[in-house]
């Protein structure tokens, strides 16, 4: 069995049953529905027999027969890869992790989550004790009362729309727990003083940001440099401190540290220098969160740019993040723009909420404006 599936961060489910029970027909329908809903679905066929995708005599087939480990071909609309088994793990993971979700045909003996098809006599193809069974598809005959007694959902194979909704709901229920983090590790060179210590209405802005995140996230952290003295912020009891392990790389290094230490969690991050950010903004992005994408971020009007420092990053973002970091590509905005993120349009009345303060003059303007408002 291919154990690398256990490490997948993209949700998947197997469709298991004997030949002729309608697996491929159902998967074809589900694929069309996901496509119609603009969900990037992947399909994986686990075949215990040999298969052939190339044609003898073609250039690619000749080179594969000559000993090429990987053969690829592309045209303006498609590409294909045929590889020998030693290349399988990285080839499959790199290809399928880009999808929002994955439908697998096969793996009936695996421990993975699966939808099982009964045969025409209503018999299971695997043990009824299999803990991976999420639902059962039948042809009108069910020869196993324990399925009903255990509360396992039962679908006739013609109930394709109900099965689609069940599968889609299963994928969204796989969403990772959400952690929050306030980034305070910047050098603050233009400000001339640590931005994490700036106060508005007599209160630290970093502490305000922590308080905004606490009711919305399972845990909250302050992301900072190891040599940074946070003063009284270190005494906060409702958040934890995480020191950057990748120094000198800006927010990319901070996020890589967070995701490296907590790889099974999604992250809602904010900066410590956004004095007009409100609870409504954070609640909005959580409500719009799409856990099947690499993340969810705000997009400014007319698509002039994303807001990487008020965004949700899903666990699968760790792969392109570390790849970009290894190439010294240190712009979160550019990484986001290369990936299928969900974009949330910033409402006109909130456009100013994402302004950050980088200089003393900007801070004084923001401080004066905040003093005219009710402290948040």
What are these regions (language model features)?
Residues 31-84:
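N-terminal phosphate/diphosphate-binding loop that engages ATP/GTP or pyrophosphate donors
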Residues 43-45, 73-74, 134-140, 221-225, ...:
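Short internal beta-strands
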């Amino acid at each position: 069995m291919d154990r690398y599936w256990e490490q997948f961060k993209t949700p998947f489910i197997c469709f298991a049953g004997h030949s002729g029970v309608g697996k491929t027909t159902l998967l074809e329908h589900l694929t069309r529905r996901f496509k119609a809903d603009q969900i990037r679905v992947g399909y994986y066929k686990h075949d215990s027999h040999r298969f052939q995708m190339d044609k003898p005599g073609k250039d690619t087939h000749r080179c594969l027969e000559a000993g090429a480990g990987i053969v690829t071909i592309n045209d303006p609309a498609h590409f294909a890869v045929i590889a020998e088994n030693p290349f399988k793990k990285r080839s499959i993971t790199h290809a399928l992790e880009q999808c929002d979700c994955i439908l697998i045909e096969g793996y009936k003996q695996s421990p993975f989550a699966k939808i099982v098809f009964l045969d025409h006599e209503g018999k299971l193809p695997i043990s009824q004790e299999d803990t991976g069974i999420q639902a059962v598809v039948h042809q009108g005959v069910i020869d196993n009362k324990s399925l009903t007694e255990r509360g396992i959902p039962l679908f006739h194979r013609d109930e394709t729309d109900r099965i689609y909704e069940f599968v889609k709901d299963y994928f969204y229920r796989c969403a990772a727990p959400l952690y929050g983090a306030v980034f305070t590790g910047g050098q603050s060179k233009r400000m001339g003083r640590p931005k994490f210590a700036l106060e508005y209405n007599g209160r630290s802005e970093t502490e305000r940001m922590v308080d905004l995140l606490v009711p919305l996230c399972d845990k909250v952290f302050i992301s900072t440099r190891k040599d940074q003295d946070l003063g009284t912020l270190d005494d906060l009891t409702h958040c934890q401190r995480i020191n950057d392990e990748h120094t000198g790389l800006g927010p990319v290094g901070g996020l890589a540290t967070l995701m490296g230490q907590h790889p099974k969690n999604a992250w809602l991050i904010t900066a410590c220098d956004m004095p007009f950010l409100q609870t409504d903004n954070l609640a909005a992005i959580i409500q719009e969160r799409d856990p099947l994408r690499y993340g969810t971020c705000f997009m400014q009007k007319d698509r002039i740019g994303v807001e990487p420092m008020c965004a949700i990053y899903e666990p699968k973002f760790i792969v392109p993040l570390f790849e970009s970091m290894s190439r010294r590509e240190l712009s979160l905005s550019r990484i986001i723009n290369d990936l299928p993120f969900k974009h949330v349009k910033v409402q006109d009345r909130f456009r100013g909420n994402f302004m950050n303060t980088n200089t003393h003059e900007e801070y004084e303007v923001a401080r004066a404006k905040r003093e005219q408002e009710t402290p948040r």
